[in-house]
Amino acid sequence: TMALHLLPEPKDLMLVKGMCALDQEMSIVLPAASGDASWFAARELRKEVLRATGMALPIVKEQAPPRPDHAILLVCGPEQAEAFALDPSHKRLDAAGEQREQAYVLAVQRGRIVLYADTPAGLFYAVQTLRQLVRLHRDHIPALIIRDWPSLEARGLLLDISRRKVPTMDTLKHLIDELSHYKLNVLQLYTEHTFAFPSHPRIGAGCGSLGSEDILELDAYCRQRHVELMPNLQSFGHARNILRLPEYRHLAETGLRWTLSPAVEDTYTLLGDLYGDMLPFFSSPTLNVDCDETYDLGQGASSAMVDELGGVGQVYMQHVLRVRELAARHGKRIQIWGDMLLNHPELIAGVPGDVMLLAWSYDPAESHPGVGELSGVGAGLWVCPGTGSWNSLFPRISGARVNIRNMVREGMAAGAVGMLNTDWGDFGHYQHMGLSWHGYILGAAQGWTGGTTSDEAFDAAFGPLFFGEEHPAIMEALDLLAHTNDLPGVQGINRSNTVLALFDDPLVGETVEGDEALPAETLREMHSLASQAAATCEALSPEHQRELTLREMASAADMIAHAALKTALGQRIRATLRKVAPGEPPSELDEQILALDKLAAGLEGLREEWELLWHARARISEIHVALGFFASTHTRLRIAAAWLEEQRRALAAGESADAELETYNASDHRVLWQIWPD
C-alpha cells in the first residue's frame, strides 16, 4: 500500500484501485446555486493544479447533474447534493454534532473527483486536502475516499506582535494562507500596545502598530479562509509599555510598572477607551483579555482592597468581572489565561458561564495538571501549548513536539473545545518567524487529529508538503539545528542558552564561567551541527520556493556556530590567563586578541543578514531592542580585546596578569532574560 502523507492526517482514508488522471478535458464544476465561498475554494484549487501541472482548469456552474467524467465537483449542502444527484456514500459525513460543521468527504475516482460538505468551511477543508494530493501526485491522483473532521472545534495560533516586532500586512496574509491550508481556524495577535488607538495615540506610537483599517482588511481576509481573527488585548499585567508613559504612571500597581491597578478607577476608563477604539473592527464575538502573570498585584495601590475583599485572588476576580462587563458593551465575551486561577484555585468554581479559560504550559511534560483543574467551568476550555521558538536562536522542537501533543491529548480527555498554539517573542523577538513554520503546522495537525499524529508521520508529511524539492536535505538540516538545543547545558526552562552564548559577555558571561557554563564538548558539537546545517541551507536557498525560510535557517545556524566559537574562545582565554607567568607573554595571547577582533567583525556580518531578514517579514517596529543586543555584544568583544592587550603588555613588562579579571568590568552588560520582566 502506498503511504499518503497528508497534513493534518484524515480521520478515515481508504485507498481504492486505480487513479484519476487530470487532463485538459477536466473542469471544476459548481452547482448553479453555489455562492462566493465555493467560487473562492474553486480558485484556490485551480491555482494549485496550475502550479503542479501547468494546466489551467475552467471553473463552470451547472444546473443539472454534470457528465460522469472529466469533472471535479464542489458540492455544499444537501440541496446542492440533490441537484447533482450525488451518490449517498459521497455525502455521508461520519462526524457528529459540532464537528459536522467542519467535516467533509473527498472521493477520487477514475475520471472524476467529488468534494462534499454540509458547510462552506467543510468544503474549503476538502479542497485543502485535494490541493495536497495534487501537490504530491501532480496529474495522477490515487483513487480513494476520505471522510474527515476535526477532533477540536477551534484550532488557533497566537502570534506575539508586542515584544517589539509587528509583521507586515503581506506577511500576515501569507501566514493566514498557510495556516488555513493546514486547517487552522483561529488567529490571535497578542497585543499590549501595538495598535493605533485614536483616543490614546501615544500608546501605539513609533512601534509599527496595526491600525483599524489593517484589522478590517485582515478580518475579511481571514473570513474568506474560514479563520476567525480574534481580538487580543492585554488588560491587567504586562502593561509596562503603557505604564512607562508619564501620563499613565498613576495607573501602576507598584513601582515595577507592570500591572494596571484595580484600585485606580482610571484603569477602567482607559480599558473602556481602548476597547472602544479596537473592538468594533473585529467581527469575532470573543476577546482574549489575557490577564496573566499579574506578579505585583496586591503589593501596592490595591493592598487595601486585598484586606477588604479577603485576598489577592478576590481582587483578581473582581477585575476580571469588570473587564468582562467592558467587553460585553461591545458584544464580546472574554477569554482569560488560567495561571492566576491555578494560583488561587478557590476562584475556579466561580468563573462565570460565559468566560472561556485558557490553560497554558510550554513544558514538554508528560502531564499538565492545570488542564484538568480548569476543565468543566466557564464557557469551555482551550489548551495552549507553544512552538518553543522564543528565548532561542532556533526553536526547541523536541520539547515543542511533546508539549503540543500532550497538551492536546489532555485537552481532549478533559473535554476541551479548542487549542491555541502560542508563538511568543520575549526580549526583542529576535528569532526569525520562518523558523516557526514547523511548530505552527504541527499545532494545526495535532489540533485536528486530537494529538494522535506521531513525530515521524508529521515530518514525513511536512517535508514534501512544505519544502517540496530537496526536502530530505532540508529536513536533515532542521533536525541538526533542533539538536543544538538538546546538548548538555543548553536547556533552561522555556529557553535555550544558545542565544545567551551569542549575546553574553565574552569573558565573564554566564555561559563562559560558573554554574551555567557550557561544556567544551557541547560547544564543539554545537559548532559542528550548526555549520553543517548552514552549508545545506545556504546551498539550497537561491531560487528555492522557500528561499526566505532557508535564509532564516542559515542565519540562525550561523549565529549558533558563532556563539559556540565565541564561548569556547572565552573559556580558552580564561584558561590561558590562569597559567601564564610574568615575563614572556605566550603567543596564544596574541592569537586570542586577534580572534576577538575577528569575532567582532563576524558579528557585524551576522547582524547585517539578520536585519535584512527582519525587514523581509516585519515592520521596523522596535527593532532597536534586538539591535541593541548585537551592538552591546560587539562593544564587549572590542573591550575584551583591548583589556587582553593590557594583560599582554603587563606580562611583557614582567608583571602578573589579572587572572581573576578584577580589572575587567562588565557589570552594565545585561541582555535577554537578565532584563526581566518583559
Language-model-detected regions and their locations in the chain:
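Substrate-binding groove of N-acetylhexosamine-processing glycoside hydrolases
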Residues: 2-25, 29-32, 39-42, 66-68, ...
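Contiguous, structured surface segment used for ligand recognition
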Residues: 2-155, 406, 413, 418, ...
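Solvent-exposed loop/turn segments at secondary-structure junctions
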Residues: 34, 79-80, 120-122, 164-165, ...
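A generic structural signal for short coil/turn motifs at secondary-structure boundaries
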Residues: 36-38, 115, 166-167, 298, ...
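A structural preference for short, hydrophobic beta-strand core positions in alpha/beta folds
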Residues: 59-61, 231, 336, 383
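Aromatic/His-enriched, Gly/Pro-containing loop or helix-boundary segments
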Residues: 92-106, 200, 206-215, 397-398
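N-terminal small/glycine-rich loop or linker at the start of catalytic domains
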Residues: 144-162, 251, 382-391
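Substrate-binding cleft of carbohydrate-active enzyme catalytic domains
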Residues: 152-338, 349-350, 356-358, 367, ...
